[in-house]
Amino acid sequence: MIKNGTCPYWERDDLSECARREYIEFKFPLFILLTGMIYAFCKVFRAFYLRGKNHTNEAPEFEEQGNGNHEYARFSVLRLKSAWESRSFCNVNNRSTFDKFKKFIEGAFIVLQLTIHLYILSSMPMDNKKFFHQGFLVQMFLWILLLVVITLRLISASQSFRWVLACKRDLWAVSFYSYASLFTLSILPLRSVFIGKIKDKIMVKYIISETFIDLALLLLLSTSSIEGTRYSFLVENENKKLPPAPTVFGLLTFSRIDRLIWKAYKHCLGNADIWDLDINNKSIAILANFEMSSKKGRLLPNIICYFKAVFISQLFLAFVSSFLNFVPSLLMPRILSYVNDPKSKSWNLVSLYVSSMLVSKIIATTCRGQGLFLGEKGTMQLRTVLISNIYSKTLRRTILKDSTTSLQKNASTSFEENPDSSEAEPRKKSSRKDNSVNNVMSIDAFKVSEAMNTFYLACEAVFMTVTALMILYSLLGWSAFAGTFALLAMIPLNFWCATFYGNYQADQLILTDKRTSGISEALNSIRVIKLLAWENLFYQKIINVRDGEIRLLKKKATIFFLNHLIWFFGPTLVSAITFSVFIKFQNQTLTPTIAFTALSLFAILRTPMDQIASTVSLLIQSFISLERIQDYLNESETRKYEILEQSNTKFGFEDASMEWEAAETSFKLKNISIDFKLNSLNAIIGPTGSGKSSLLLGLLGELNLLSGKIYVPTVESRDDLEIGKDGMTNSMAYCSQTPWLISGTIKDNVVFGEIFNKQKFDDVMKSCCLDKDIKAMTAGIRTDVGDGGFSLSGGQQQRIALARAIYSSSRYLILDDCLSAVDPETALYIYEECLCGPMMKGRTCIITSHNISLVTKRADWLVILDRGEVKSQGKPSDLIKSNEFLRESINNDSKNTTHNQIDLKRSTTSKKTKNGDPEGGNSQDEVCAEVENFEETKMEGSVKFSAYKWLADYFGGLGVVFVFTSSSILIHGITLSQGFWLRYWLDTGSSGSKSTWLYRIVEGHSNIYFLLTYIIIGLVSSFLTSGKVWIAIISGTNVTKKIFAKLLSSILYAKLRFHNVTPTGRIMNRFSKDMDIIDQQLIPNFEGLSYSVVVCLWIILLIGYVTPQFLLFAIPLCALYYTVCTLYLRASRELKRIDNINISPIHQLFAEAIKGVTTIRALADERRFITQSLVAIDRSNAPFFYLNMATEWITYRVDIIGTLVLFSSSVMIIMKASYLDAGLAGILLSNAFSFTETAQWIIKVFSSVELLMSSVERIKEYTDIPSESNGYISPPANWPQTGDVELKNLSLRYSPHSSKALDNVSFKVKAGTKVGIVGRTGAGKSSIIAAIYRLSDWENGTITIDNKDIKHIPLERLRNSISCIPQDPTLFDGTVRSNLDPFDRYSDVQIYGVLSKVGLIEECDELCLIFEQEQPNFSSHKLRNRFIDLNTVVKSGGSNLSQGQRQLLCLARSMLGARNIMLIDEATASIDYISDAKIQKTIRETMKNTTILTIAHRLRSVIDYDKILVMEMGRVKEYDHPYTLISDRNTIFYRLCRQSGEFENLFELAKVSFDNKR
């Protein structure tokens, strides 16, 4: 009996009558009345005072404030609000009519309750009712308060009482709080009624009616949508689905997602089926709130500050859940005591214990679910914050090398930034590459965000550990501290393991960066790699890095094994030490009740110990990743917004000196003073490497400004500029030398966020000579350009990039050599119709070019650059007198001006003939321009068995899997035997004197024998369990090594068309996220699944063996378990696949931003790109959010099912108490306790395996892609010996549905003949090279080289036998030597020889090198040529070289090593004419006996060749000597020469060549 003064709380097995009257009926209701009344009064008074001014149905407004977290306003999320709202609208999820009707029912129940109170109060006798009257009066006042509250909630819909809306949610909260509290208070009196303790009929009726009404009211509110909560949604279109309005029941049990789960069960889900996110979970809201709460400084404190409310809530929920989880353990000794002696306690009391176990577990489950879901929601929000900040940083990051490190470098560092790079590569302090930057977003951001899930688990682990130790102390006394000290002794070992694990993780991330950088570089240059037959070279380089990763993964597995062994053996060691001390030193008897209660606590303790181990490991990984993100966010940012000065009258430089980086060898622009002529065409010319592109980048503010000033029209964001009457804004548009396109349609790339105007669009297409190409494409302007424009020819890419600049509303255009990639006819047309046509009215245009005769013809201002200095500038007519080369070019052009204008008009007219078909024919030059808009496919249904079998085959087949599962059964059998051994030991008796306990003989054995056996069983079990995990991970690592090699080989050797239609970001997703999942998550989850299934089966068999009646409960419970699992698995599978697909666009946007950051900043379009990233993040977050909700949905239900198993087991035990011994009951209950966790773990792990297997499916899909067809006949070693090439009736198309790129092409090239291939852009010129290299399979026809059909020759041999200089000069990360000779086949002399031939080094360079070697103190930084040192660094893509230097280096690479056939695809387009002439001379002199096929837009480059092949519409139109063709006015070649602007020179050169060969 528990007493409180004169009033006992508890009498034997029930609440006392005085306690019920004092507390249940008076004090507790009074507390509810006072708190509810005060809270409601405060909220109503405030709402009345404010008159509802703050209530709105719209989305919450974000005030335009901030703390300067971002340096520039254009990157502020708060400033994005207006842009976001302009493309979205608010939708409000209002309450249903049925929900509104429920309020009237609610009011009726309250009136009924008041009526019952009045009736009972008037009918009860007046004697001995001191507390009774007070209690009834308090409860009456409480119900009157609730009647007032429901009245206010009902009248809120009236216009006269709209102010109530402001406090409607608070009034609803008062009602729910009161109903829930009253129902909870009514439970114990109701129990008293059921067990017969209350016998007064009126009181019985009152208690039953009160409980029923309280329950009814609680259910009404729990199942109705929460009042006062307007869930507003910013959605992109009206078809976006909204989730159901939230209810208390739905939020607590996650039933809100029932509809989506049921829909997924009936059919496969798509993006359209996924509900939208509410405004609080939209990225714009998350980032705005984060920005307002953040301060300048490190990321970690800002994250903690922003999520502090989440952390506090999780802390509270973890405390409640942890405490309630131990209630069953606290009640277990009482139940076992009853089993041991059924007469010691009443059955009513024991049933209360069992019921309390059920209720406590349900509440603990609810709290745990809410805590975990808060963490998962925080994971999504943190991921949003990190990805958005990384993306925003990418748009702010400088394209220059970090000055903080460059200053520390030795001045003799190899070469630095290029003078003419248009899209330079961003860099990090530690030489971070763009490709590794992608890992910061795709891997590190995800790892850090996952740490949000660990906070709740960490708190729960700490609370559970402390609570368990406290209970153990109360159970075992001070001997529990012995176990505690043993537990503490393991912590340093754990941290030692964690330290090693963290170090290995950091090293692995470095190698992962290196691997993904290599893969990204290979994917971006795959065409060139195939042309050079370097697939195996890149394969080996990447595999070597991968091998280092594998070694680190195995080291991590070993550390994980040790860590697992420590914590798995911990409970056994702790229990053994505790029991020994309890018996020996405390001289106590270890009874089954105490032993198995302690074991149940130790079993529960194992969970937090495991959580601590895994949490520490994950937190270490997260902190490493967070540091990498912080390093990235700390990198230098562009200073363009500081150094650029706004001017309405001046556009140019004033005595400006600029550099790429602070190094003596860095290229510099010195003392630049240029005042570009407004509303005019300004041209910049100069030799290769003179600094033309650097000058334009300097004008955009991308270079370091050392001195002087730079004047631009504006530095404002594009969205903030006013549109003039002419539709223009004072902004700049930039077209880089290397065209940058986004993944999307042609229309998307041209319109580029501007308002679409069809007439303007058509005019731009026509002026950029794209209208005919568009007509030839099946999808027209909706044709997908592919990843970075991969599905277009180089000329088409350049013209689309130009069209983007022309279509923009910018009044100032900056064009970097945008005419070099197109043929002369097209270049002339674009120049006349676009750059000098009506589209340029009122615009200022600055253009750089090597085509001097063309661009200076109608330029108003001319700037001549050389070696970073302005040599001269002025009107072209004034510069003729002082510049002989310029004068000769312009004079030559003037002779042909009349002819050119006439021919231009004639060609423009002729292009409109032939039923509208473009004269150039097919617009697929290199690859199919009609490529479909390929969306990433989503697997449907469950993961196919073939995927599991495919993975199992790498392990050695299904037999190995069977052996592995069987070992799990055996190992857990050993684990269970430990409990039976303890029961056997206790049954034999373990008490004795303190001095003789260890040596007392029991049945022929001492107690030390039993203790050591107990420890050995635990040690063997732990070692086998941990060893099985280690073997699984090591085996999995070997498997992932094979899978990666297969995937890499499949991608590298895939047909080029696969790369044309598949975005690089999508492929990289396989190599980064999917591969990381297989590396580190899949195999441990498989192992955990097999272990959990075995444990559950053992538990069910054990309980069924002890209490066969349990099977009656087990069958429906298993059916329920199967049902919810099936529902969940289908939904989670679909949601995960959609999540996987929706992640790829984020990768794609990030990759595009890295490549095009200069263009984006030039257009001042950062805000739009940030908005696009937020939209992509929201699309990715939606399935991720509902996937997490579905995960908690199944977790909650599995926990409830597990609780029912525990409840039914306990019921069976107390029902069979007279037939069971306490030891067996203890074993059964101990295992029943762990069933909930194990069953939950099964579904979690199985669903994780299913979700993770989607990554296996995705990788398997890419390992099954068709590879290039290889030949089988190896030619002789000296093949090709002569170099004869013949094409017969060759037809080629790039996709089954596209038109032919080559149509019945036939021509023959004799050995040593030099053939120039000409024709307008898209005529099929590059397709000839593609056919010869077998980059695409042709439909029919043959190609023979030295009379051997190349279709039967192995690809590597074929491609190694031909030299090629591709259209896009592609270089790789490494050195000059590694780019020229990666296999180390040639000497330095040979390499210097080819560098000299292409003009990259001269004799004076060699003298400088000798002089430096002889006189170390001599400094020749200003004179020394960077290519002298063959170990000079070349950045990925050659980003630290000018376009011309890249082309020359590629030319040198092809000339290194004599081959009898060379194919040149527009290799000199980006170098000046003088250098071009020298190179052509070199080719003629050094390759006299080499068969050369050259694609050229510069006709001068091929005018002295042996033959000219004219292509049109994929057909051979003309094939003869240049002089023969140019002499015939009816030939296409004649027209091309006329339109080139240098007809007279071409004619003379052709005639001289013809005469010399006659």
Curated annotation (Swiss-Prot):
SMART domains: AAA. It is a multi-pass membrane protein. Residues 424-434 have a biased composition (Basic and acidic residues). Keywords: ATP-binding, Glycoprotein, Membrane, Nucleotide-binding, Repeat, Transmembrane, Transmembrane helix, Transport. Residues 651-892, 1285-1538 form the ABC transporter domain. Signal peptide: none annotated. Residues 1-29, 125-130, 191-201, 324-351, 471-481, 580-584, 975-1013, 1106-1109, 1221-1222 are extracellular. It is found in: Membrane. Residues 51-103, 152-169, 223-302, 375-449, 505-558, 606-953, 1035-1082, 1133-1199, 1244-1558 are cytoplasmic. One of its GO terms (molecular function) is ATP hydrolysis activity. Its main location: membrane. It comes from the Eukaryota. Residues 311-621, 961-1251 form the ABC transmembrane type-1 domain. The chain crosses the membrane at residues 30-50, 104-124, 131-151, 170-190, 202-222, 303-323, 352-374, 450-470, 482-504, 559-579, 585-605, 954-974, 1014-1034, 1083-1105, 1110-1132, 1200-1220, 1223-1243. Pfam families: ABC_membrane (PF00664), ABC_tran (PF00005). Residues 892-901 have a biased composition (Polar residues). Residues 410-434, 892-926 are annotated as: Disordered. One of its GO terms (cellular component) is fungal-type vacuole membrane. Belongs to the ABC transporter superfamily. ABCC family. Conjugate transporter (TC 3.A.1.208) subfamily. This is ABC transporter NFT1. It comes from Saccharomyces cerevisiae. The lineage of its organism: Eukaryota, Fungi, Dikarya, Ascomycota, Saccharomycotina. The gene is NFT1.
